[in-house]
Curated annotation (Swiss-Prot):
InterPro entries in the record: HATPase_C_sf, His_kinase_dom, HisK_dim/P_dom, HisK_dim/P_sf, PAS, PAS-like_dom_sf, PAS_fold, Sig_transdc_His_kin-like_C
SUPFAM superfamilies assigned: ATPase domain of HSP90 chaperone/DNA topoisomerase II/histidine kinase, Homodimeric domain of signal transducing histidine kinase, PYP-like sensor domain (PAS domain)
Localization of this protein: Cytoplasm
UniProt biased composition (Low complexity): 1-10, 18-27
Full protein name: Sensory histidine kinase/phosphatase NtrB
E.C. no: 2.7.13.3, 3.1.3.-
Domain spans labelled PAS: 29-99
Length: 400
């Protein structure tokens, strides 16, 4: 019997290419580019070859104080001041440079006032003549530094107030008592002098009493406060008294969430600011603008814990007076700084203290016919504040 021959080896079938793993499968972005641009913290504009604005993100609308409907289609030359270096940067990019930037650019318009910014212009590539304009306002560190300076000024007044309460009021009581004893046994002509002593002692005591509010170290009792209710209350008080001849303009954002604060203390802040604005405004044609807005604020770390307060609520008080003298600006929030004949110079020092106690930031910008004080305040967040057993006592200056 013939032996069966060995079976010939089967031809090897070529390996089937393995499908790529799902982890390597390219993922196409499914996010609308405008959503990503609106999430950026800086103003962004797209400008075409004709110099017209084609797109603005939310930050750009907030920065320039105009809506997208008003800005898109507007020539950039109508938005920026004449001879702005921004136009030169755009021209450089449209002539072939991929990117151009400049620091220290001043954008100053009647609506927003002066802003010192860094401008970056980048070629989009498609369409070829379109550019992306980014505005970066490097004022955060300056705001925090100024706020801490105001807090230090308030602390110095606090120490002085505590000292005065013990070291001045007690001797004054003795002086006043001695003057009253002298008055019982002196002539009528001398009683004029003893009454003068008593009146001046009372005046000094009243001043010390005003300063003692700075030494109040009790924690703030805070809750959700409607800032528009506060502003309306202060406006009515002002118009019924010291600001009866002032025209008030209200530019409120009705969608603002509540402030995390103390209502009475907030009233004191804005009553002081509005009173100063009314006294600075001209007798004829005086005008005060009260405005509120939501901004992407910084987060301040609170002392003694990990809690951070978001400061997105911006309240502005603007007047059309002559402006703040240059020699007062660097020390404006110090105690006893005033241009008023009978002023004590404690109003703005107290404002700085209360704003700091709320964990907020106060700043000002002044030029002839336009002085504005801006107060950034924390937003009430029930979920966040439920774990914060102790109210805040100012800011530590950390940025997150």
């Amino acid at each position: 019997m013939a032996r069966a021959s060995a079976a010939a080896p089967l031809p090897r079938r070529p390996a089937r290419p393995r499908a790529p793993s799902s982890s390597y499968r390219p993922v196409r972005p499914c996010i609308d580019p405008s959503v990503m641009l609106n999430a950026l913290p800086d103003p962004v504009l797209v400008v075409d070859g004709s110099g017209d604005i084609r797109y603005v993100n939310l930050e750009a609308q907030e920065f320039f104080g105009l809506s997208a409907a008003m800005m898109e289609g507007m020539p950039l030359a109508e938005l920026l001041p004449p001879n702005s270096p921004v136009s030169q940067l755009i021209e450089q990019v449209q002539q072939g440079r991929h990117r151009a930037s400049q620091e220290g650019v001043v954008i100053d318009t009647p609506r927003i006032g002066p802003h010192h910014v860094t401008v970056r212009v980048t070629a989009l590539g498609e369409p070829a003549d379109h550019v992306l304009l980014t505005v970066n306002e490097r004022t955060l560190a300056r705001k925090i530094d100024n706020s801490l300076t105001h807090r230090n000024a308030a602390r110095s007044v606090t120490a002085m107030a505590s000292m005065l309460g013990h070291e001045v009021k007690n001797p004054l009581s003795g002086i006043r008592g001695a003057a009253q004893l002298l008055e019982e046994n002196c002539s009528e002509s001398d009683r004029v002098l003893t009454r003068l002593i008593c009146d001046e002692a009372d005046r000094i005591v009243a001043l010390v009493n005003r300063m003692e509010v700075f030494s109040d170290q009790r924690p703030l009792e805070r809750d959700a406060v409607n800032i528009h209710t506060v502003l309306e209350h202060v406006r009515k008080v002002a118009q019924s008294g010291f600001a009866r001849n002032i025209r008030f303009i209200e530019r409120y954002d009705p969608s603002l969430p509540p402030v995390y604060g103390n209502r009475d203390q907030l009233i004191q802040i804005f009553l002081n600011l509005i009173k100063n604005a009314a006294e600075a405004a001209p007798e004829s044609g005086g005008e005060i603008i009260l405005s509120t807005s939501y901004q992407h604020g910084v987060r301040m770390a609170l002392p003694g814990g990990d809690t951070r307060l978001h400061l997105p609520l911006l309240v502005s008080v603007q007047d059309n007076g002559d402006g703040i003298p240059d020699d007062l600006r660097s020390n404006l929030f110090d105690a006893f700084i005033t241009t008023k004949v009978n002023g004590t110079g404690l109003g703005l020092a107290l404002v700085a203290k209360i704003v700091g106690d709320h964990g907020g930031v106060i700043e000002f910008d002044s030029q002839p016919r336009r002085t504005v004080f801006k107060v950034s305040l924390p937003m009430f967040d029930e979920a966040q504040m439920s774990g914060d057993p102790a109210p805040a006592r100012g800011i530590r200056g950390a940025i997150g």
